Regions:
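Sec/Tat signal peptide C-region and signal peptidase I cleavage site
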Residues: 22-26
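Bacterial N-terminal signal peptides
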Residues: 10-21
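Gly/Pro-enriched, hydrophobic low-complexity segments
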Residues: 148-244
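Edge/loop elements at the starts and ends of beta-strands within beta-rich repeat scaffolds
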Residues: 44-48, 147, 210
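Intrinsically disordered terminal and processing segments
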Residues: 28, 39-43, 72, 87-88, ...
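Flexible, processing/modification-adjacent segments and terminal tails
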Residues: 27-34, 95-169, 189-193, 245-246
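N-terminal mature ectodomain segment of secretory-pathway/periplasmic proteins
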Residues: 31-106, 134-142
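Bacterial N-terminal signal peptides that target proteins for export
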Residues: 1-12
Length: 246
């Protein structure tokens, strides 16, 4: 699987801390992130047995275009990754996040970081609630980073000492009057590029109880960036059928 490296790390746009479980929120979290997570479906999250989505990235200035499809079972930890290599041949890898220590090196070093990256983009409101280590602050009526208008600014910062892939990251979430994120600015805590990503949060769809922003347009270090999700669906407990996002 050494060929995986070329297309999993070719553009890990941004990566948050490692924790991706729904059991890490024993401590009381700030009301603002709890309410935000509930807006995106937190109260019914336990009904979801599997999630499927394709993370798509287009960076024209860097001539980078990629698509990564994930099927994730949050309760079991199983992840299936699908993409195509440089020759257009299909690649498929299945592993369990609870058994990473025994996984192949390419899975640990390339596939898993790509999964974390894409999953944070996909359901970041949940991570803001689950990640106890993150410091959360809020300010009312802040100017939007893209377009006109104002919104509540909720800043989620990961301390340097936390570890993970990129400690010190900050996510500035601009929350509109309906309680949904309308834009955000990502500040990387480490030296890797891009160091600043600013995009919209739009194209909202629901897959079962899950609310997802499927369209993110803006810039990465000042250059055009388009991140979007397709093929979004969930499989609910007790059912073998996929419920497509609408």
């Amino acid at each position: 699987m050494t060929k995986l490296t070329r297309f999993t790390t070719a553009c890990g746009l941004l990566v948050g801390v490692l924790g991706l479980t729904c059991t890490s929120h024993a401590q009381t979290r700030p009301p603002v992130v709890e309410q935000l997570a509930k807006t995106y479906g937190l109260d019914s999250y336990g009904q979801i047995d599997a999630v499927r989505y394709t993370f798509n990235l287009d960076l024209p200035a860097l001539k980078v275009t990629l698509s990564r499809t994930w099927t994730w079972e949050p309760k079991t930890g199983q992840v299936t990754y699908e993409t195509k290599d440089k020759e257009g041949k299909p690649v498929k890898v299945t592993y369990n996040r609870k058994q990473l220590s025994s996984a192949a090196a390419d899975v640990r070093d390339d596939v898993e970081p790509a999964f974390v990256n894409d999953n944070y983009w996909f359901i970041f409101p949940f991570h803001a609630y689950w990640d106890n280590s993150a410091n959360v602050t809020e300010k009312d009526k802040q100017s939007l980073p893209l377009g006109k208008g104002t919104a509540k600014l909720v800043s989620v910062k990961y301390p340097q000492e936390v570890g993970g892939y990129t400690p010190g990251d900050t996510w500035d979430l601009y929350v509109g009057s309906e309680g949904r994120i309308v834009a955000f600015v990502y500040h990387r805590g480490g030296p890797k590029k891009p160091s600043n990503v600013t995009t919209t949060w739009a194209g909202y769809k629901k897959a079962g109880p899950l609310l997802v922003s499927t369209e993110h347009r803006g810039t990465a270090d000042g250059k055009p960036a388009h991140i979007f999700f397709s093929n979004v669906a969930v499989k609910l407990a007790g059912s073998d059928k996929w419920v497509d996002a609408q």
